[in-house]
From Swiss-Prot:
Propeptide cleavage-removed residue intervals: 29-223
Tagged with keyword Glycoprotein: no
Cofactor(s) needed by this chain: Zn(2+)
Alphabetized Gene3D superfamilies for the sequence: 3.10.170.10, 3.10.450.40, 3.10.450.490, Neutral Protease Domain 2 (1.10.390.10)
Record keywords, A-Z: Calcium, Hydrolase, Metal-binding, Metalloprotease, Protease, Secreted, Signal, Zinc, Zymogen
Domain of life: Bacteria
Pfam family, one: PepSY
Biological role stated in the UniProt entry: Protease able to cleave casein in vitro.
EC number: 3.4.24.-
Disruption phenotype annotation: Cells lacking this gene grow normally in both LB and SG media, and no difference in sporulation frequency can be observed.
Family the entry assigns: Belongs to the peptidase M4 family.
Protein name, entry field: Neutral protease B
Signal sequence region: 1-28
Amino acid sequence: MRNLTKTSLLLAGLCTAAQMVFVTHASAEESIEYDHTYQTPSYIIEKSPQKPVQNTTQKESLFSYLDKHQTQFKLKGNANSHFRVSKTIKDPKTKQTFFKLTEVYKGIPIYGFEQAVAMKENKQVKSFFGKVHPQIKDVSVTPSISEKKAIHTARRELEASIGKIEYLDGEPKGELYIYPHDGEYDLAYLVRLSTSEPEPGYWHYFIDAKNGKVIESFNAIHEAAGTGIGVSGDEKSFDVTEQNGRFYLADETRGKGINTFDAKNLNETLFTLLSQLIGYTGKEIVSGTSVFNEPAAVDAHANAQAVYDYYSKTFGRDSFDQNGARITSTVHVGKQWNNAAWNGVQMVYGDGDGSKFKPLSGSLDIVAHEITHAVTQYSAGLLYQGEPGALNESISDIMGAMADRDDWEIGEDVYTPGIAGDSLRSLEDPSKQGNPDHYSNRYTGTEDYGGVHINSSIHNKAAYLLAEGGVHHGVQVEGIGREASEQIYYRALTYYVTASTDFSMMKQAAIEAANDLYGEGSKQSASVEKAYEAVGIL
């Protein structure tokens, strides 16, 4: 059972739904939800925002607000010794400023504890999102081993697990964190190792900076393994570059460019190594006319353009980093490689084995799903474990279904060729693939990093209900359409969601986004609440 304490302006009492319990208390100033583990606020919604001190800067008002809540945060001393501003975002639509924060201990970031604060134009704080760790006592922040030693240990342990690694995909680094786990607090190096062979992965190792032992490890690769019925053969139109009578799959009209290359079935490990270290992208795809006869490359190029256009036209976003980053795609990576992934530098696509998968670049929603992982990386930075990881996957599914908006299925174009109507996941009916559609049926085990690909379907169902409406578990939801829904989720992702956002926090983030866009008390805000209630997220 999940226990949450919630302070509310409107009522006091005890209510239950699914397997969640909320305890409410009256307050005239703010609504607070407390994290069940630390009993510190996971979000604060200001009903009567504090009056800012005159002649102060925005950051001074921010830290004054944080100081005001130090008791609730269970922190000692000034807020500026516990929080670091990592990013500042100005929203021209509402004139609000959004601060992304990182909680620190003696200057060292606490892993997974990031926050977001929304401030009005008059410097009044409107809301606070993100879990806060209470005061940590007596942890040394002086490492006893070097970063190099930590990297060596991580690689040794990984090879013991998956076999000899000939090449790493890029140069590994070790970053110091305070790592909370099992009631302990360790100074640890987070070492990230990217591999394609002998097993694809984006491995995270937490190495104790005192004794060099492995505290924890997991694989956080974002990939779409298996979606759709293959490259469809439909005719596509897309932008290319012509030079001296030769045509290239290079589009310089969008951001800093969209380029598509051919790996010529180069081993995926070697390709990714060259990609990371020297920027190798494969061979240029050239045609003597404007007609290209490479179906996998045509789809990769056209779909990348479609996803760029979707984000640009729908949200005003300039590529995945909001700064026009070049989108590079390479097809024919490996031989019969059943995978597609964003590797931190570019998109890579395998051809599939012809049985379970066909060329994965043929699926628009897969391309959108993977590029959205990059958007999430550059905005919210959701952790890839438990409920934050499930939200990471769900948001990619939601945006995939919005970019390819003819249905609510994911990967139907390239998954299991020969099986009509099959898909990898369904937002409309997650049970088609045996996935849960209500929080009471969530997966609670440790596989799949706490069910990131399983429990994502619960949030997917909420998104479907928000857009289309319907009755689910006895709750009537009035649909608000795809257009309003996608705006709400994008705003929540880029302004309110933080690394540790869970399902309940995501609900409140979506409500705040709806309030920003359509006004408090709007039908859109009401539908958000009902959609989450219908799937048991309260």
